[in-house]
Amino acid sequence: MNKRVIFHVGPPKTGSSAIQQFLHQHRQQLLASGVLYPAHSVDENGISSGNAREICVPDPEGRLVLDHQKLTNVLSAFENNPNSHTLLLSSESFFRIIDDITQAVPDAEIICFLRNPVEFQLSIYNQSVKRHGNQEPFAPGKRLNLGQWESILNTANQLEAHQLHCFAYKNHGEKGNVITDVLGVLGLRDELSVSGNSVNVSYSFAALELKRWLNQFPIDALQAELDAYLQAASAGAGRYRLLDD
């Protein structure tokens, strides 16, 4: 295949929701520049699972695994599409099956992001309070989780240098942007403008503590409305730390 096939694989907690929302909203502009990004659903908060279902199916335990027939169909349709020279697929689900993907598509390019493991741990805690009813105060783990770093290093050792596009994750407000990093790989950094809006906003400290306290009550029916309100209330709030220096 003389065309480019690119998989954005996340991993989790590295801005995938913002990337996928932007790509989904700009599908027509991308296609006009020769980049095919298949459509997918996006919820009211701009959150999506991306293109996972395009090439994956659930196994008996409900985990998404690569479906080689689906992948073949997608690649064949792309190869026969005269209007596109690049296929871009995005999903955090791809990170777990990255070895299967690179074996099935040896020339594939991979886009991924690395996040400070301390920030990753804090983000996981924030999410546990937001979405999973955690009522406990933050307690740092005894060891940092370096699993993502190790997986990416293993992938790097299996690919040619030009096949792996690995970037540092940028927090909102820091110089640079995960979306512009992706556009740079596509050669479209100057073609599309990127707003400073956030997707799946982290709670401010006050919102986080309020939600943690509320989690002791039966609030399942209010979760979506409450989450939308707390995200809106947290927009523009300053950064905070749950760890002492």
Regions found by a protein language model. Name each.
Residues M1-D245:
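Anion-recognition interface
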